[in-house]
Amino acid sequence: LDMGDTSVARLEKGEIEVAVLWDYNSLGYRSQIMENNPDANFEVSVPSDGAIQSGYCTIINKYTKRPYAAAVAREYIFSDEGQLNLAKGYARPIRDDVELPEDVKANLLPDDQYTNARFIEDQEAWDQAVEDLSSSWQEEVVAYAQ
């Protein structure tokens, strides 16, 4: 487990064996790697014993001179076209009534991968878990790897 620079270049070189990344980043990285090396072996999955999920956020400046521009941007993101655009970038649509073309759907992980994914409810606990993850991996996984 590498908690440092998880760039496409390092993944492609094989310097990173396991990386913990958001699904859309992982799928995008895999796409880039496969374009450069179609024989590469790069698997993306959501841990079946549990994972976290999070949504995007938007910061809207309440002092802006154009307050409706942010509203229009949000309207686009939630529109069918906006949701499709996000899915083309490997992000799962937040709306479940959006019809995705088969070629776009094929580039996303199947819904059943997210069965045990949960939202972060305690940010402080999450921050601590992230801090402890690398050492726990070394002690509890790497130490027993052969």
Model-based region annotation:
Residues 52, 56-118:
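Mature extracytoplasmic/periplasmic domains
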Residues 9, 111-146:
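Conserved C-terminal helix/tail region of periplasmic/extracytoplasmic solute-binding proteins
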Residues 10, 14, 29-36, 63, ...:
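Structured segments of extracytoplasmic/periplasmic soluble domains
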Residues 1-43:
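Ligand-binding pocket segment of bilobal, Venus flytrap-like solute-binding proteins
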Residues 1-4, 19, 49, 66-70, ...:
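Solvent-exposed, acidic/flexible segments
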Residues 1, 38-62:
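Periplasmic-binding protein-like
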Residues 13, 31, 47-53, 74-77, ...:
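Catalytic cores of transferase enzymes with a strong primary signal for eukaryotic protein kinases
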Residues 6, 10, 15, 28, ...:
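Extracytoplasmic/secreted proteins, especially bacterial periplasmic and envelope-associated proteins
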